[in-house]
Amino acid sequence: MIVPLGQVLMLAGLLFVAGLVGVLLRRNLIMILIGVEIMLNAVGLVLVGASAYWRHPDGQLVALLLMAVAAAEVTIALALVVYLKRSRGTIDINRFDGMKG
């Protein structure tokens, strides 16, 4: 049984909006990273859902690539968060103003 594409798009839209709200409203770097990951998962869900709907495997392959890129992104971002926590003592983004002119 294939889930209708409209339902897949609705769920993906809700996930994307939830991730976007998390990114925009949170000041903690880890919570922002979780929001970005939720948004990436929503995009992957759209790719897999559309791929199943049109019975074409390209969307699933791109979703697999997206998962690999997301894993690399999480690894780098968490390394940066650990570095910032050790060097500055906080992960609140309001405290990072070193680039201001």
Swiss-Prot record:
Membrane topology: Multi-pass membrane protein
Function according to Swiss-Prot or TrEMBL: NDH-1 shuttles electrons from NADH, via FMN and iron-sulfur (Fe-S) centers, to quinones in the respiratory chain. The immediate electron acceptor for the enzyme in this species is believed to be ubiquinone. Couples the redox reaction to proton translocation (for every two electrons transferred, four hydrogen ions are translocated across the cytoplasmic membrane), and thus conserves the redox energy in a proton gradient.
Organism: Syntrophotalea carbinolica (strain DSM 2380 / NBRC 103641 / GraBd1)
UniProt KW keywords: Cell inner membrane, Cell membrane, Membrane, NAD, Quinone, Translocase, Transmembrane, Transmembrane helix, Transport, Ubiquinone
Name the UniProt record assigns to this protein: NADH-quinone oxidoreductase subunit K
Pfam families: Oxidored_q2
Family: Belongs to the complex I subunit 4L family.
Reactions catalysed: a quinone + NADH + 5 H(+)(in) = a quinol + NAD(+) + 4 H(+)(out)
Assembly description: NDH-1 is composed of 14 different subunits. Subunits NuoA, H, J, K, L, M, N constitute the membrane sector of the complex.
GO biological process: ATP synthesis coupled electron transport
Residue stretches spanning the membrane: 5-25, 29-49, 62-82
Chief localisation class: membrane
Lineage, broadest ranks: Bacteria, Pseudomonadati, Thermodesulfobacteriota, Desulfuromonadia, Desulfuromonadales
GO CC annotation: NADH dehydrogenase complex; plasma membrane
Superkingdom as given in the UniProt entry: Bacteria
Stored HAMAP family: NDH1_NuoK
